[in-house]
Amino acid sequence: LNPTEKPPLCSRCGECCRKGGPALHREDLPLLRTPGGPDLADLVTLRAGEPALDQVRGRLEPLETEIVKLRGRDGAWTCLFFQEEGAACAIYAARPLECRVLSCQDTRDLERVYARDRLTRRDILPPGHPLLELIAEHEQCCPVSGFARLLESDAPEDRQGRAAMLGWDREVRLLVAEKSGMDPAILDFLFGRPLEQLAPALTAARRRT
């Protein structure tokens, strides 16, 4: 924008919110500790290798590194905090950086911050947190890219590998939910979405290539 121009006003159509919640950046870290802001149960981790919508380019691309974002709702990507009535935001005062800078009429501010200083789980959980080691082990035993490769083959050893990975992924979630007493909704932040849930998207992405 020219310095003399006023920023375009939001028409509050809600389209950006329906396309998915924002990824979080380092600047958003204080919001996770702000009363009325999002908490860990409101987040989902998209892991390296997952197909995800690049909101700047407008297309699905596999992630090179993980991102943490506000989760969707009702089985869709519509932001958890989007309120259809009035096209309002339930956490407007504590909305993340991408929401603050986005204008669908001029996306240059979003483009400048989009891939910069994105938060990861290790940034959000304090050093020494007891679950960090388990998260790392899950990432090693259940990598998205490795699971995607196993989906490409119907060989007996690959079917066994898929079953073992799916079992490990399910068991670690059950274990943490039972032993910790945490809200089960936090599991999608800690371990990303279940591999079983990712399988259709990974298969569809493979067919597009």
Which ranges hold each PLM region?
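Hydrophobic scaffolds flanking metal-cofactor catalytic centers in soluble metalloenzymes
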Residues: L1-R208
